[in-house]
Amino acid sequence: TELRQSLVDYEKKNLSALSGGKEVRDRDAVDQLLVNLIMLDEAERLGLSVTQEEVDAEFAAQKKNYEDFLEVRTYIDEYCKSAGITLEEYYAAIQEQLPRVILRQKLRNELGREYCAEHRLEFTKVNPPEDMQRYVENYLDGLLDTYRADITYCK
C-alpha cells in the first residue's frame, strides 16, 4: 500500500486537532496510518468484518450524541474549527472512516477476549481488566515493529 502525501497531511491535521493543536511530524502521521492499516490486516486475518448495518447504527448514534449532548456538540464544533472543516465535511469523513474504526475496535475486543480466555478472566468492554488492557496495547504497539521489515519510507 502506498501512502500519498495528501493522506499524510490529512492525518497530521487530524492528529493535531485531536491533540489540542500540537504539531505532528510526517513520520508520526505515517506510522499512525501504517498501524491502522496493519490493524485492518490483523482483523481480517482473524476473520473479523463489519456490516453496513453496524456502520449505519454507529453513524446515527454519533449524530444523535451531537444533537443531544452540549459537551459533544462543543467538542465537535471546536474540532471542526481547528481542522478548518465544516460539520458536513466532518460527518462525511466520519462516515468514510467508520468501517475501519469499527473493525479496529473489533480487533481490540477479540484480542481482549483471547487474553481473558487464556488467563481465566472475565472479558468486559466497560472497566476491562488492567492486565488485558496492557496486553492489547502492547500487542498493537508491537505491530509496527513486527512489519517494519516490509515497510519502505520514501520522500
Protein language model features and the residues they cover:
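A C-terminal, polar beta->alpha supersecondary segment
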Residues: 95-155
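N-terminal targeting/tethering segments
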Residues: 1-94
